[in-house]
Amino acid sequence: MSSQAIYRIYGLRVRSDLPLPVASISDDGEVDLIVRRGGAVPRPVAPQPPGMALDWQEVDQGWLLRYHTRTDEVLEFAYNRDASQLEIRSTTPEMTDDITALLVGAGLATALHLRGVPVLHASAIVVDGEAILVAGAAGAGKSTLTAALVAKGAPLLAEDLAVLTFGENGITVQAGYPRLRLCPDATLIAGRAAPDLPRVFSGFVPDDKRWVEATTLPGGFRTTPAPLGGIYLLAPRRPERETPAIEPLPPHRAGLALLDHLYGTRWLRIPKVKALEWCARIAGRTPVRVVHAPPGLERVKETAEAIVADVRSFSQEVTEGTES
């Protein structure tokens, strides 16, 4: 039997026989989720998909999240009804690095969804003790900008999933894992050369991204939750943009904009009423901004500086308003 360890990630205490990219913690007997590696599954006889296919369905024992690649590899995350147990099955069980990369993303996000926890597809860094989220459409530069912020000295809190907890005194963002996944050219933002860095995926996913350890960067990694202080949504880049610009959104527009950044809204089939409720609560208690960034990798640090300055400007306004 494989050895198991206990980890705290996204606010969950996870017992897993698959090593997770966070430090293990002491076992006091309390566990929210048990992760086990199951047996190998046969390759499907169905036609190969043109790319990575994702299937989410209810099954007799609970729920099944299934990946099917164009090379006919399969990865399954099987959840019981209350998402307290997760079994992982694959045609390539030896690809533990690939499986782990998907587990700490979609695998755990799905478990949180089944538990009714809101998750934004966003990174989180910490500025002056508050969690600042960065979200954007695919290719908008979210991870690259996050790397620039951590390289500038802001601790990383979560790389791709902003797991939220609603409380009486505000919203809290849970800590994820201390890694960034970056495209090869973007690793230079973190002062690293791509050939020297491990690949996120070794073959299961056709992806050339690399892991960068946040603990090797000036900002490092924050292991504890932080109160949500602001959300920055990246607008599509325009070639004519010369300097960063940051636009505040009123709560009603912010709530609608956040709908596009709830994790797995479409394939997890989150009820629209629930999605609207979550986004309205977030927007009603949190400043939401749109970031118009100039194009070019060489301008990313400039955008990072503009965001930090905006966060501190807003925090100062709140402090002055409270004192008056």
Give residue ranges: language-model regions.
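Long, basic/Gly/Ser/Thr-rich N-terminal segments
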Residues: 1-95, 307-312
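Glycine-rich, often acidic-flanked micro-motifs
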Residues: 2-19, 23-24, 127-137, 151-314
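Extreme N-terminal, non-catalytic leader segments
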Residues: 67-131
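Short glycine-rich, low-complexity/disordered patches
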Residues: 116-121, 290-293, 324
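Conserved lysine of the Walker
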Residues: 142
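Post-Walker A alpha-helix
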Residues: 145-146
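Short, low-complexity, charge-dense intrinsically disordered segments
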Residues: 316-324
